[in-house]
Amino acid sequence: MYGGDDFGNTDFYDDYAHTGDPQLDMEYERTFYANRMPDNVKFFLMNFCQAIKEGNLYDIQNMYENTFPQISDHHFDKSAWPEEQEVGAIVDNDKVFLILYKELYYRHIHARIPGGPKLEQRINSFFNYCDFFNLIISSQNPVMLELPDIWLWELVDEFVYQFQNFAQYRARLTDKSQDEIQQLCVNHSNVWSILCILNVLHSLVDISNIKKQLEAISQGIDPQTVAGDFGKLGFYKMLGYFSLVGLLRVHSLLGDYYQAIKVLEPIEIHKKSAYSHIPACQISTSYYVGFAYMMMRRYADAIRTFSDILLYIQRTKQLYSTRSYQNDQINKQAEQMYHLLAICLVLHPQCIDESIQQVLREKNYHDAMFKMQCGDLEVFKSFFVFACPRFVSPCPPAADAPMEDYVKDPMEHQLLVFMDEVRQQKDLPTTRSYLKLYTTLPLTKLASFIDPNASEDDVSKLLIRLLCFKHKMRNLVWSKGPSGLEGTFKSGSELDFYIDDDMIHIADTKVSHRYGDFFVRKIMKFNDLNRKLKNINI
């Protein structure tokens, strides 16, 4: 596996017989594996282990964010890092470091190895996560471990990703033998099970008291007073916070959108917080929250969520542009959110920030949006399939299930639900366009606009369409409070109407832009900045 120029010629290493002296055997192993490994890899692992032992956050973060990806690109672009036995020999089999190393090892295999991980590697990765979480959760006292927040976020995010990836792997029966299916369904039925994932994430939330801490912050109370012995440590506190976001993602992947928003209740998702300093976490949170709102038909909240985070991405690109893999991931998620935003704006037209409108124009979203407004269901479908999460089923196929590919079943179910909602609304843009032209309009005249050969039955059906318009344009909209599920019903349409006998009375409720307030705020901000500059002594 590790042959080639990077590791030199290893032909002269033969299997050796144990001497019977544990000290001599360990020394021999250390020399044996050290000579197989490139010097820069060996020194990196030794220094990485030492930094984690000493809790040197600056060095850990530098090696995690910079050195590890650089060595991966140079030595292990399409191959795995050295295995546990090789690494253990040069770090004195440090238990904590080896668990953390294997987390990176299996993550690298998922990301870089052509064809993806084998079943055994997927199972071993799961048990390694179990070892890590048992180490920090089952301990009677807090584990004194310091890791950078970016690593903690990516650890939780990767944990959920590998669950999702395994669920899809498990659902694809067409490329598996009967022995593999037997292993999956009988011998390893609990590996990467949904109950294990939820149990771990909820345990991290509970042990950190993160919900109590967030509630204390919202009430102006010192969170340390309710944090407990574990939650006082930044390591546990941030793991608890990131686990809330992990639960949001898991419930979204399962199609449980109410619970996805519910689990975030301590977090005021429409406000910035001290915990939102990891761009990838903030972007992922907004993506899943916005998608959940869209599927719950809360389009105004979805539009606000997508618009806010897309503005944030525009303004903070330099924070993550140095890390190419993170940049690619964020760019892809941003592209997905532009697609979802376009869908929401078609179903629920409203004003958004001009810079977001500019991007929609530059990337030709307006052409697709026009087709959707004209009732082109295929465009709705293609936008949804591109932008939705890769849904999974909580239940694996049975051992005696037909040899088919079940991966797409969860996504097709969610697509069916979404398209059913779209079909109910596909005629509303046409109705809206006619109503905007009049202040009063007879029902018969509107029916003739829609269908020149309209009959009495068509007029009756028009009443149903107008009632549908009223219903669909009234959405629950969040206004304040920590719960993203709360809100008040508001009409999202730029017009309102009522029907008196056979006459439709229409009122334009569009609020004109108040540019004066915008310029006053900017002038005041500029004057304040000018005063501060004058007070600076150079």
Swiss-Prot record:
GO BP term, pick one: formation of cytoplasmic translation initiation complex
InterPro entries: eIF3l, PCI_dom, TPR-like_helical_dom_sf
Predominant location: cytoplasm
Lineage top rank: taxon: Eukaryota
Keyword Cell membrane: no
Recorded GO CC terms: eukaryotic 43S preinitiation complex; eukaryotic 48S preinitiation complex; eukaryotic translation initiation factor 3 complex
Intracellular or extracellular location(s): Cytoplasm
Domain PCI: residue ranges: 305-513
Keywords: Cytoplasm, Initiation factor, Protein biosynthesis
An annotated Gene Ontology molecular function: translation initiation factor activity
Biological role stated in the UniProt entry: Component of the eukaryotic translation initiation factor 3 (eIF-3) complex, which is involved in protein synthesis of a specialized repertoire of mRNAs and, together with other initiation factors, stimulates binding of mRNA and methionyl-tRNAi to the 40S ribosome. The eIF-3 complex specifically targets and initiates translation of a subset of mRNAs involved in cell proliferation.
Subunit structure: Component of the eukaryotic translation initiation factor 3 (eIF-3) complex. The eIF-3 complex interacts with pix.
Similarity comment: Belongs to the eIF-3 subunit L family.
Protein name as catalogued: Eukaryotic translation initiation factor 3 subunit L
Lineage of producing organism: Eukaryota, Metazoa, Ecdysozoa, Arthropoda, Hexapoda
